[in-house]
């Protein structure tokens, strides 16, 4: 199986980091130019092409520009595999420099939405192959759904004897994603893992989805996992 690197902007550090993580995860590295997306005509065609090629994960190197990022977000909304954004604002970070492993610390915000628990699987894979510590940033809600989701993720990872801790956020589920960039200095992650929006609401259409905000303001790579209705039962 393969990890695919789509390059809209080319930075050697992006490529080096993506290749190291691919090697660490025991996958084959494959690289294409972003123009390949236009050859598939639509999102469904792109998804089918990835399936035919046996791609398990995508890296996307792109300029830190909201229209460019949104174009890739739109293209990836139907994907059933994780995808990682690497923007030019991340290219000088120590995490992208030469080091033994690509990941030491992974930050994953957790909201009240049930699909958050699906991140457990990819967090487990990343931690198992890289040895990275997982930090769950639990939304500060009045209800207990975010706490319940964070607890289920922690239990899943703990059963595999993987390092995980829960940190309480300052904001609730509606705003915790926008807290993520400001917490990168004190929590020092090497990657952020987010659940993409189910559907875009009016605020998302006017101001952009929360995941785009994180990507535009992040100083480390950002991985997105699309919510999948057929997997919501995992959260019951």
Residue ranges and their predicted role:
Residues 1-28, 94-137, 143-160, 231-236:
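Short acidic/Ser/Thr-enriched loop-to-helix initiation segments
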Residues 5-8, 38-40, 60-64, 109-112, ...:
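Structural motif
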Residues 6-57:
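Extreme N-terminal leader/targeting regions
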Residues 27-34, 55, 81, 132, ...:
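Short glycine/serine/threonine/alanine-rich loop segments
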Residues 33-42, 140, 166-174:
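Short beta->alpha junction loops
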Residues 42-46, 119-122, 179:
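Well-ordered alpha-helical segments embedded in enzymatic catalytic cores
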Residues 45-99, 183-236:
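Gly/Ser-rich helix-loop-strand patches that form or flank binding pockets
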Residues 149-199:
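Glycine/small-residue-rich hydrophobic helix-like segments
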């Amino acid at each position: 199986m393969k990890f695919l690197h789509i390059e809209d902007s080319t930075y050697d550090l992006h490529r080096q980091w993506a290749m190291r993580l691919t090697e660490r995860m025991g996958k084959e590295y494959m690289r294409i130019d972003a123009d390949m997306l236009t050859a598939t005509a639509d999102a469904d065609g792109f998804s089918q092409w990835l399936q035919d090629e046996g791609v398990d994960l995508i890296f996307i190197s792109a300029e830190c520009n909201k229209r460019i990022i949104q174009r890739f977000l739109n293209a990836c909304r139907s994907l059933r595999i994780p995808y990682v954004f690497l923007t030019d604002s991340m290219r000088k970070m120590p995490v992208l420099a030469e080091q033994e492993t690509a990941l030491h610390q992974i930050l994953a915000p957790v909201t009240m939405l049930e699909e958050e628990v699906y991140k457990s699987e990819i967090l487990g894979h990343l931690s198992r192959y890289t040895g990275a510590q997982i930090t769950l940033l639990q939304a500060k809600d009045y209800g207990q759904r975010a706490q319940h989701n964070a607890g289920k993720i922690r239990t899943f990872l703990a059963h595999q004897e993987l390092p995980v801790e829960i940190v309480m956020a300052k904001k609730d589920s509606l705003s915790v994603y926008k807290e993520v960039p400001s917490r990168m200095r004190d929590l020092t992650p090497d990657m952020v893992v987010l659940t993409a929006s189910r559907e875009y609401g009016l605020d998302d259409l006017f101001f952009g989805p929360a995941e785009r905000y994180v990507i535009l303001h992040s100083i480390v790579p950002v991985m997105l996992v699309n919510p999948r209705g057929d997997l919501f039962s995992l959260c019951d």
